[in-house]
Amino acid sequence: MKIWIRLFAVLAALTAAPALAQLNLGASSGQLLEPEKAFQFSAHAVAPDAVQVDFKIANGYYMYRDKFHFALEAPPGAKLGKPELPAGITKKDEYFGEMVTYRKAVSIRIPVERPSPEATTLRLKVTSQGCADLGVCYTPMDSEATIRLVASESIGV
């Protein structure tokens, strides 16, 4: 019975070792930032019918262009238009092939179709994904913002 316990312990350690090594825990250099610090999110209204999503990206990190997804949780009847994503930099990814990425910062303008011209509050949900140059990619992360849109003179975009 003792041999089975030892064998199990060795197998568990061998299974966990690659994941722990990839995280580089305890290293004085090359430590990974928490995702909220590596990819600092903010969002605000830029017009009565548009919002802007901003990510400040830490040095040594990048975000994937095609991993951004946007959704409105409120108000009913409001819809997002097509996000205006900047060009970015093409990177050859060993797993995904050629991918467009952003470094340092990215700003994305999103038109908003409103059901009425009155002032309203939006609840925006943004899903994004980024990686560190160390070779570690974060799981997709969700960010949320409550944004106040001023009254507009006309309805829609």
PLM regions with names:
Residues 7, 19-157:
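Extracellular/lumen-exposed scaffold segments
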Residues 12-20:
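Hydrophobic h-region of N-terminal signal peptides that target proteins for export
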Residues 1-8:
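Bacterial N-terminal signal peptides that target proteins for export
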